[in-house]
Amino acid sequence: QRALAGEVWRACTAAPSKKGTRLFCQAPTGIGKTMSALFPALKAMGSGCGEKLFYLTARNTTQAAAEDAIARLRAVQPDLALRSVTLTAKEKACLHPDAEGHPACLPEVCPYANGYYDRIKNALAALLDGSGQFSRAALADTARQFTVCPFELGLDLSEWCDVVIGDYNYLFDPVVHLKRFFD
């Protein structure tokens, strides 16, 4: 754990541009990789090295581990001013009853897409006044309440978050690449 935490710290603080470098790590399950990566990265952000942390994984269980680690950090330091969002694939996040894994993201077809930009401000305000940790369930609940697309809500909310948790395809896949952050 200590060696990994040190490497994460060095990767986050090494570059003169204060943007850090990329660090890819692989280790067995259960050794504390999540906290060993998150804690020094967040500490580096607090020192002015970077504005946003992307915790990208291949599995939902690892995303849940990152959410849990952030919740534990909040429990230890309740006044921690940290916002995190977990992004979910559009197919999994879609609330349209007729979508069945194939989102129909057209305003003419989907009530969550129709008028999205008329309602998004209120949905974001409601979330940003809350806990600061935004899971898939929290996004879905807010999306239902304000009738907005939960996938787009998560993307828009990510602009105000310090930590973005999601699938690594958001970085590597040109089809779902997060252009707002990685272009």
Per-segment meaning from a language model:
Residues 1-5, 30-37, 62-63:
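Phosphate/oxyanion-binding active-site loops and adjacent basic polyanion-contact surfaces
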Residues 1-25:
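Conserved pre-motif I regulatory segment
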Residues 3-7, 36-40, 167-173:
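Well-ordered alpha-helical segments embedded in enzymatic catalytic cores
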Residues 9-13, 34-49, 70-73:
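Walker A/P-loop NTP-binding motif
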Residues 17-39:
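Walker A/P-loop
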Residues 18, 29, 49-164, 168-172:
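A substrate-engagement module of RecA-like helicase motors
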Residues 37, 65-69, 177:
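Residues at alpha-helix caps and immediate loop-helix transition turns in enzyme cores, especially N-
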Residues 177-183:
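Short, conserved "post-DEAD/DEAH" coupling segment immediately C-terminal to helicase motif II
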